[in-house]
Amino acid sequence: MPVIDFPRKDWALRPYQKELWDYLCAGGRHAECVWHRRAGKDEVALYHTACEMLETPANYWHMLPKGNQVRKAIWEAVNPRTGKRRVDEVFIPELFEKRDTDMLIKCKHNASTWQCIGSDNYEASIGSTPRGIVYSEWALANPSARGYLRPIIAENKGWQIFITTPRGKNHAYSTYQAAVKNPN
């Protein structure tokens, strides 16, 4: 059986991403990441999620503020450095299969799934059991999604990553300040 390098050998963390990556790889369960635009927030979160999918069979979500943003911003987004779709770079065909109609990725060697959804319609997730959620552009998301989904994450001993660009003093500012005060 061939050996598959994952994450890919040609993918490298930027220096400022290393602290977040190390925290997540050490089992960190709550990350607040407020970085500038084009800093690779989603990229780090996608690779972490893919690694988690391979290790722990479960459901994982990547959430943007609006459901109609997800296809453009994540599912069809092309990495300007490589010219490849981000989901194709991260979720390689040797390990994952893609279902375009509902933006779903399945792990080939266990039952893990990853799906893109919008926080504007989090109520539609009734009965779902995500173990990991990335809240992309958290400052623009519906903050009620976090409260609704937090008990599910806790029950599943899961994790949440809140990634965003600064957008003033709003719910993202509040959750970031709370994380600074309680880093554990």
Language-model regions, residue ranges each:
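Phosphate/NTP-binding elements of NTP-utilizing enzymes
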Residues: 1-184
